[in-house]
Amino acid sequence: MLFRSSQRSSAAKVSPITVATKEAFLERIALIWPVQGDVSRGFEQDATRRHDGIDIVAPKGTSIQAAAEGEVIFSGWGPGGYGRIVILQHQADLVTIYAHNHENQVQLGQLVRQGESIATVGQSGRATGNHLHFEVRHKAVPISPYKLLPYRPSNVAALDRG
């Protein structure tokens, strides 16, 4: 069940999560691919070529689905070169970002289910072609989407330097 942050109980105390516990916890979160298509650029965190997400090529207007249930915390024109973006807040301080959209289909505060259409593929912002730029962040830190997405052999060729 989804809860707004104002509905969550503040009475429960949670002990700090260690790095090992965090990795084990994140492995249990099952995201779905937000769009079908080939990955044209992977996740990179080295000093010279930073890319905080993956780029998935798809035709303009293709439906983008919520990778997990969550609440829309942003839907509009994003900062920098992101163009139209949707940002979803999920359980356990996990956030997913969907960028370069042609059209956003959700509104701030809306609760969405996993697999629900939230936007369509486009090339808004600084994009060189129609694709979805997809990011996953845990407590504001970018993590490789591949850690949470099901394995797809067609995407093995894309670099992932996370």
What spans do the regions from the language model cover?
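Acidic, glycine-rich catalytic/binding loops that coordinate metals and/or anionic ligands
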Residues: 31, 57, 110, 135-162
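Active-site loop architecture of trypsin-fold serine endopeptidases
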Residues: 49, 80, 121-133
